[in-house]
Amino acid sequence: MKTRALAVAMIALLLLAAGVALSGQVASEEATAWAKKTLAGLSLEKKIGQIICFDLAGGYIAEGDPRLNQWVRLARDYGLGMFVFYGGTPRDVAHLLNRLQKEAEIPILMAADFEAGPGQQVTGASEFPANMAFSAAGSEDLVYRAASAAAIEGRAMGIHLTYTPVVDIAWRPENPAEGVRSFGGDLDLLGRMVRAYVRGYHEHGMLTTAKHFPGRGDVEAMPGNPGWSWINKPAGDVVAQEFRAFKHAIDAGVDFVMSEHIAVPSVTEGSELPASVERKLATGWLRDKLGFKGILTTDDLWYDNVVQRFGTEEVAVKAFEAGHDIILKPKDPAATIKALAEAVKSGRLSGRRIDEAVLKLLTLKARLGLHKNRFVEESRVGEFVGTPDHLALAQEVADKSLTLLKNDGVFPVAPGRPAKAVNINVQKFDGDPSPPALTVKLAAAFPGIQSFNLRPDPEPAYYDKVYQAVQDSELIILSLFVPRTRLGDAAPFREADLAFLQKVIAAKPKAVVAMAYGNPHLVRKIPSVAAYLIGYGEKGWFGNQAVYFESFIKVLKGELKPSGKLPVRVSEQYPIGSGLSY
């Protein structure tokens, strides 16, 4: 503990020396005065520019690149107050963000989506397992430490706001809309995780966002409105479940809430408008009844169906009328600024309402000290991003969250065994890099193991080849890379793959071990496996899968005993809290 405390103190001192504020969470009189003075000096159009957030593509961007020219114009000429970035390396990110800060009259609040930590967006930064992993480990300390590490790395690169945590509650196993992005289905546990998460970010100088209000954990497609989603259940259930989760986040002190394009007719007197444009949700519920006083942002307004219905400019005006403070990723920022300005001049929108939103944002910038120093030292980014301690923390989270849901005499594996083993990678998407990476790891750990990849639509002869290898094996590993679908099947195996897996299980009922990477629900379709383990990292943005390769290999070698507990209900047989040990 002393060593860690010293390391944290050293990092804090180095960050301060680099001009990265770690404190300032309460606005001082001086900061408030700066915000008010700055607001008073802005034209209507520049005020509106402050409340527009546009996206940046990461990676190396050369001077003269048309994309950079556009971003510079938006920062310098239109006064955009926020940008959200995606991709790049740590030095590339720091350089680009410094470049834009240099062009802006007012410091820019830089945002990113750190659901799995900075490594979700930045190559070489730390990437952690998904939210559900922390609940499976049941450790507020792990959440706090991961959030702290993410904030340290983010601020070192010039990022001030994360569009996390996801606080969507996972209720129904037949509709796992958010999957491992969710902290799970236990509201009290979710509340504890969110408090630790927000505290870790705040104590290390980054702002947080609760999303996706009114809740995306139990949504369905809306009949008669193709592409629209709704929460179709009684008002009392919505308030006790979805809204209670957001109340936990509000009480934890989140700075932003992100609304989603989701309708809740049961709490809006039958209105089928989504929260992004429905005042009864954005203001009536979130602000007036749940007590949120911070900044309310829309979700992406680029191509969603709500934009298709109302149009790019009109949807921004409607979002502001509903009570939003920030317009996220409009397709045309200049046109959006013009539309909002015209709405103010016509009397449709209140100029005072614009001022209130801008003042909130400026005050947050001052709280972070950006009015004094908006830049980071690019040469020192490597001291803080993707450090060995942070990477080790990601592995610790995986080790402590790995969940053994079923064990019919397979574990612990006897020393020296298995003598003959087969690994079958079942992958939903062709080109997924995870199965080949796992194959390499397993081959290094167990020389002689045979690995096969069930890619989309294999030839029948390939199934025969794999089945023949199974006959001579003492252990058959099913490595499952089959993520849930957003609004549909929780365990979307391809029919041919599922039939083959069931054939393998029937042939070797005591020898088949399934390891699910990112989807707890797959066991429902292969219930007869001898053992079933879960790791909480899903292909794409939703958690580090690779750390679970190491955890699983440790279990096979007898170096790790799974201790995670299921934080979401899979079935009546596997309720919340399920998880074996030995």
Model-flagged regions — what are they?
Residues 57-60, 110-120, 160-170, 210-216, ...:
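Short glycine-enriched loops at secondary-structure junctions
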Residues 43, 83, 93-108, 112, ...:
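Second-shell residues forming the walls of enzyme active-site clefts
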Residues 9-18:
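Bacterial N-terminal signal peptides
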Residues 51, 55-57, 71-90, 173, ...:
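Short acidic, glycine-rich surface-loop motifs adjacent to enzyme active sites
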Residues 22-74, 288, 309-582:
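Preference for extracellular/luminal or secreted protein segments
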Residues 1-10:
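Bacterial N-terminal signal peptides that target proteins for export
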Residues 89-93, 136-149, 188-192, 238-239:
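Glycine-rich anion/phosphate-binding loops
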Residues 44-50, 78-83, 104-109, 155-161, ...:
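Loop/turn elements at helix/coil->beta-strand transitions in domains of secreted/extracellular proteins
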